[in-house]
Design a protein with these regions (language model features):
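Short, well-ordered alpha-helix to beta-strand connector turns
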Residues: 2-3, 25-27, 42-45, 174
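Hydrophobic/aromatic beta-strand patches that form the interior of the parallel beta-sheet core
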Residues: 6, 27-31, 46-49, 146, ...
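Short alpha-helices
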Residues: 33-106
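Short glycine-rich anion-binding loops that position phosphate/pyrophosphate groups of nucleotides
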Residues: 10-13, 34-36, 153
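N-terminal small/polar loop signature for handling phosphorylated ligands or for N-terminal nucleophile
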Residues: 1-24
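Solvent-exposed alpha-helices and their adjacent loops that cap or buttress functional pockets
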Residues: 20-23, 40-41, 74-79, 138-141, ...
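A generic local secondary-structure boundary/capping motif
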Residues: 17-20, 47-50, 72, 136-137, ...
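Hydrophobic helix-and-loop "lid/oligomerization" segment in the mid-to-C-terminal part
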Residues: 1-4, 88-187
Length: 187
């Protein structure tokens, strides 16, 4: 019961990796930027909840600047992981950014994060790119929604689903996007 479980980037019990581990821990801390919704974690011992923050990575970076020793900071790999979270949630600093977002990114650069290496984390294979392109091409407009209903895509290309949905949101006049596909052959 002395174990601390730190839940990051979600407030919902249904989205944690292991509900069993969460329930067995004596103490729970939540760090999240999403609005509190249904099924949230009840009675956490510590909450860092900022719905106006760009990402959970931004919040973690801010916390790291105020805790521990000056020598106890993230290494390059950890800093690059946090920077990748900021880049992902802000779509390369184009959405939901503020001064705090850029300050967090600057701190991560001071910790050794290299933007070129972080960008490489987002490189896709030809299979993933082709799957995304096909899903975007299949999209049809209904009111202000882009809807793409695909056939089946390979499990190794499942990242293309979210990428296609994000790309569709960048089209002028699109307020929402939906992408539905069968992943793999298991039914």
């Amino acid at each position: 019961k002395r174990t601390l479980c730190v839940v990051v980037d979600t407030y919902q019990v249904g989205l944690v990796e292991s509900k069993e581990i969460l329930e067995k821990c004596g103490k729970v801390a939540v760090i999240d930027h999403h609005r509190k919704g249904v099924g949230y974690i009840q009675n956490p011992d510590l909450v860092c909840h900022e719905p106006y923050s760009s990402s959970a990575s931004e919040l973690v970076t801010e916390l790291l600047q105020y805790v521990g020793d000056r020598d106890d900071k993230p290494n390059r790999v950890e800093a690059e992981g946090l920077l990748s979270g900021i880049l992902l949630d802000t779509q390369d600093f184009t959405l939901h950014t503020g001064v705090r977002t850029f300050e967090a990114a600057a701190a991560l650069r001071r910790y050794g994060a290299e933007t070129e290496r972080v960008r490489q984390l987002f490189d896709v294979t030809m299979v993933e790119y082709a799957a995304k392109a096909e899903l975007v091409e299949r999209a049809r407009m209904y009111r202000n929604c882009a809807i793409s209903v695909g056939g089946e895509i390979a499990p190794e290309a499942r990242v293309a689903i979210a990428q296609a949905a994000n790309d569709l949101l960048r089209i002028q006049g699109v307020d929402a996007s939906f992408v539905a596909v069968q992943v793999g052959t298991d039914r």
